Amino acid sequence: VWDDLVADLSKTFYVINNIDKQSRLLNVSFRITDSISDYVDCGISDKKFSLASKQLDSIYKVADASSYFYSAEVQTNIPNTIYFEFFRQPSLEGRANIYVAPSEQGTKVSVNTRYTWIFRAEYDTYLYMPLYDSHTKQSSYGRRQVTSYVEPISFNTNQRGGGLSDVLCVSTGKFENEILNLIEI
């Protein structure tokens, strides 16, 4: 089982960090930026934006990349309105200990994972001019990065993780099941 598992793991995108046959432990890791919600569930968000003729409802899985619009809290160009398109770019890292040992019934296998979910954000600035009913991207600003620090959310298999934000995440079990499915006992 051990040799087959190591061989099968080497064919996946998971990185084998450490192999210790004597202690019966394998340590593997991964980092992804696409389809994160396949691996962790951080809920769903619904952002509504309404400004003159522009009506948008953005519903998205919090774990995944997304974009939505929101108005600036302070308006300095009245009657014009400044608003932003916000781009969330999350990533997920997982690191797992895989324990493989003989037992009376065959082979005992367990997978325990530590996940870390984080996102960075960027935004574009727009100007709405009601006199012309015009929405214009302010390209002179360029896409800006949000500089405030977003606390990573870390959690283990079968635990919920949350930070200072309102986001709570939990494993879907996909990673652990993919590892277990590699093993033919």
Model-assigned labels for residue ranges:
Residues 1-185:
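Ser/Thr-rich, low-complexity intrinsically disordered terminal regions
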